[in-house]
Amino acid sequence: MEQRLLNANERSTYGKNAAVKMRKAGRIPAVMYDRHGKSVPIDVDEREFMKLFKLVTESTIVTLNAAGKDYEVFIKDFQHDIVSDKIKHIDFYEVERGKTLRTKVKIRLEGSPEGVRHGGILETGITELELECLPKDLPARIIVDVSALDVNQSLHVRDIKLPEAVTVLTSDDITVAAIKFAAAESTTPAATEGEETEAAAAAPEPAAEDK
């Protein structure tokens, strides 16, 4: 289990104006949803969060310290401003240690497929798996090596090896990656308009019917 630390402050100010002031002060407004579903308004330091954000995935457990108490959470959602390229708001969800959870984990393909060197094209299927396990057993990401994949071969969910403590809920026959040849283009060139006219002129006229 990959785990990181992030400090947070509980906040008592709400609304758009308060959020704008907070961001100007270098803080990001956020909400933590605890294990009982209760929402706790918090804010985090922008620089500290962005350093963390570059190192984690959606399945990384973060230790969130707020008001002197530690919470084990996921970064479940965030709002991104495409103009300023900054994070505007974050949603954290608490997980309960020792209790099974269900979540989706990203798949990352690695390696240069054998089939691509033979003229094939790598086609990707699903990009994440739904898993069930204890928080301590949850992988941050799923690495799949496609180096040995040759032309007309596929890799499915059932081919991915995970620890015994992790249960895969995604159907095992779904394709993760495949190597296929590009569709062959027709080698017969289409006749141009001029060629069609010349062909029509050269064709013999039908014999006149007897009256």
From Swiss-Prot:
Record field: compositional bias (Low complexity): 199-211
Keywords in alphabetical order: Ribonucleoprotein, Ribosomal protein, RNA-binding, rRNA-binding
Region ranges (Disordered): 185-211
Single Gene Ontology MF annotation: structural constituent of ribosome
GO cellular component terms, semicolon-separated: cytosolic large ribosomal subunit
Gene3D superfamilies for this protein: Ribosomal protein L25, beta domain, Ribosomal Protein L25, Chain P
Single Gene Ontology BP annotation: translation
InterPro entries: Rbsml_bL25/Gln-tRNA_synth_N, Ribosomal_bL25/Gln-tRNA_synth, Ribosomal_bL25_b-dom, Ribosomal_bL25_C, Ribosomal_bL25_long, Ribosomal_L25_dom, Ribosomal_uL5_bac-type
Record note on quaternary structure: Part of the 50S ribosomal subunit; part of the 5S rRNA/L5/L18/L25 subcomplex. Contacts the 5S rRNA. Binds to the 5S rRNA independently of L5 and L18.
Purpose: This is one of the proteins that binds to the 5S RNA in the ribosome where it forms part of the central protuberance.
Similarity comment: Belongs to the bacterial ribosomal protein bL25 family. CTC subfamily.
Name listed for the protein in its UniProt record: Large ribosomal subunit protein bL25
